[in-house]
Amino acid sequence: MLAGGILLLPLVCLKYNKWNKKGVEMPNTVVIGAQWGDEGKGKVIDILAKKSDYIVRFQGGNNAGHTVVVKDKKFILHLIPSGILHKGKICIIGNGVVIDPKALLDEIDNLKKEGIVVNKKNLIIDERAHVIFPYHKILDSLKEENKGATKIGTTKRGIGPCYTDKAARCGIRICDLIEPSIFKAKLEANLKEKNKVFKKTYNFKGFSYQDILKEYSKYAKQIKPLVGNCSIILNKAITNKKDILFEGAQGTLLDVDFGTYPFVTSSSSSVGGAFTGAGVGPTNIDRVIGVIKAYTTRVGEGPLPTVFPGTTLEKVRNKGEEFGATTGRPRRCGWFDAVVGRHAVLVNGLNDIIVTKLDVLDELKEIKICIGYKYKGCMYKHMPANVEILQKCKPVYETHKGWLKNITNCKKYSDLPKEARNYLDRISKLVGANIYMVSIGSKRSQTLTK
């Protein structure tokens, strides 16, 4: 009997017949990262957005970065859904997102400089989304510094402390920010408590009420025209048979419940976050797609069982440009981990997966896949919940022959070398999900439908 063994049953989407492969209709779809983030969701969302009416970001903050390349121009989006690059689409920042107003307004300005239209007709911010303040960012940094060797690798953008306030029921939401009298009262109450903590615990001087009030009141005026009740808007859209694309940030292994806790983000980056972070019921979702790299990467602290040896690590990191879109930090890279893939399929109920960056492996003679972990003589086919155990697990590999060909110019799936198709078939079988598309480059055109 395999340790940690779980019977995997086929996951069937009740409304899946709404989809057809000719792309005539795009069902209500959730796109989830199936690893530790940075899987290439931005490009996938950009492609799928063509046939969607609404594109919704439902969790996280500006700690995430989605990269999209359009006509050789690179766009990096941190808060605004990737669908903003398509005309006629309505983009929504849901209630599950935590918003740094300055970061959001800077992102809007940068898009406008590139000729992208952003206004109340194509961008709506949910009134229930929580707001990141300067004290969140400083607290994030101070707590991380105090952890020393046990640090978790936060981006220090204030995401975690903002979600902490949300759970503690003392957070300030967008609906509060845009109402001056309410905002003043809540900010004053929060700063009274926060400044005590900063002074007594961290020997930090604290923050000026007047300074924050002045700065954020200015942001409120700019943001107010974009604010709405997105749950009502989305449910009305569903009633009117509109197609909605839900854009996840980070990845399943960073989910606060199902990730490698405590080396996780502070939100639900698995499929459940789409429902609570957008105000849409699960029965209105037709399809769940997981985006997964042809190898594995991770930025920040925490276990990565399949990390490459030195020379392969540098080769893949440089070819794959594996540096964080938000922080610029180099990502750790490793062989494809089917244990991670199975976990993502299981907890998200994935209908399909999209494999990205297959071309990065073009020059490798041999390619390994982790099929399980060994720990104290037992074989694990599923993720151990205890991160201390996971850190001691040894990957069990099978080796596949590389294709040693440039695949970036392939026009259809059948053009891929036999070895590449065999590799993809093996990934599909090991994780328990069908492959829908494969990405072989950063451009929109470098995407193959199976």
Task: Describe the residue ranges of each PLM region.
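Non-transmembrane, aqueous-exposed alpha-helical and coiled segments at domain scale
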Residues: 25-450
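Short, Lys/Arg-enriched N-terminal segments with co-localized hydrophobic residues
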Residues: 8-25
